[in-house]
Amino acid sequence: MSLKIPEHVAIIMDGNGRWARKRGLPRIAGHYKGAEVAEDIVEFAIELGIKHLTLFAFSTENWNRPKGEVEALFELLRRYLQTKKDKLYKLGIRVRFIGRRDRINKELVKLMQEIEEESKKFKNLFLNLAVDYGGRDDILRAVKKAVKLQREEITEELFSSLLDLSCSPDPDLLIRTAGEKRISNFLLWNLAYTELYFSETLWPDFSREEFLKALEDFSRRKRKFGRVLDE
């Protein structure tokens, strides 16, 4: 079977806390291990020829976690971006952040904006990092923009352009790890015709081999988009 490479893959990186708990480690240790896995999957995506990759890093609901864990997660993100940005540039990755920014530390927002600006010329991979992102919040913010327009102007295409992920095509494949079978308020508008793949593997144990399993499963599917296909 030949492998069909999707143009856009989105991933819900779930299971960091459970991975740490199984090993008697603090939850943040799972997140640090998960960041290492994310880095490897990003590199593998480039090798495979995937053009767009969206990673769910922090949701609007994650603010409900203990304050110490939230602070540690944002410190992990800041440290990762600061230490890895040059590697991202060297790999030719354009980085974009989707989600709200009004609740994030101003220094981190400044770093995010700097990376977006410095990487905008790269085209090997479009990497979307969802930070303080929620699908309902995304749609609500788009509606607030749309109400300023004439009703006749608003089309499905125009509304899509008001969403956070407007610079990337809708995902072809969504992967969620750790066995949960739900999309958890992620890219609600954009996942209309996305193929869903659920892996039992906890994110810190997710490997290139596991990623290939998802792509092999995707390659066997017939995407109809509402049409009737010949069997």
UniProtKB/Swiss-Prot annotation:
Gene3D superfamilies: Decaprenyl diphosphate synthase-like (3.40.1180.10). Keywords: Magnesium, Metal-binding, Transferase. Mg(2+) binds at D14, E195. The keyword Mitochondrion does not apply. InterPro entries: UPP_synth-like, UPP_synth-like_CS, UPP_synth-like_sf. Binds 2 magnesium ions per subunit. It comes from the Bacteria. Homodimer. This is Isoprenyl transferase.
